[in-house]
Regions:
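AMP-binding/adenylate-forming catalytic core of the ANL superfamily
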Residues: 1-76, 85-86, 93-95, 99-102, ...
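A cross-kingdom feature marking charged/low-complexity
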Residues: 123-135
Length: 135
């Protein structure tokens, strides 16, 4: 649960809205600290097929943002959507949301001993450094 401008939002509901987009294979939503709103939702998503180019990827990310706003309201609209090749997971398949949040807030991701694929976390780092977002 994240608190966006006094509204308590479930990350699962936002993930389900993003996942309803036909291009999305998998999504993770985290709350990132924001001076004005307290927290804002940020989406990390993998696509079913690789986008043709950066413009197509940004268009898909913008569509995801609109899908969330249409289904859950403007308050749930993600501040950013990052398209990554894979989401960081444990060996048992659980998403490492705390690591995603730490990287998004430029903090140390902490203990990564359970990380299944280190390349997934490195991809997230690269995407965050490039600022490849849709808004």
């Amino acid at each position: 649960v994240i608190n966006v401008a006094g509204h308590r939002l479930g990350t699962r509901e936002i993930e389900e809205a993003v996942s309803s987009h036909p291009a999305v294979a998998e999504a993770a939503v985290i709350g990132v600290a924001d001076e004005l709103k307290g927290q804002v939702p940020v989406v990390f998503a993998t696509l079913r097929q690789t986008a043709a180019d950066a413009a197509a990827q940004q268009a898909t990310a913008a569509e995801m943002m609109h899908t969330v706003a249409d289904q859950l309201g403007a308050v749930a609209r993600p501040a950013r959507v990052y398209v990554v090749t894979a989401l960081p997971k444990t060996r048992s398949g659980k998403l490492l949301r705390r690591s995603l949040q730490a990287l998004a807030e430029a903090r140390d991701p902490g203990d990564l001993s359970t990380l299944d694929d280190p390349n997934a976390l490195e991809d997230v780092r690269r995407v965050l450094e490039r600022g490849a977002d849709a808004g």
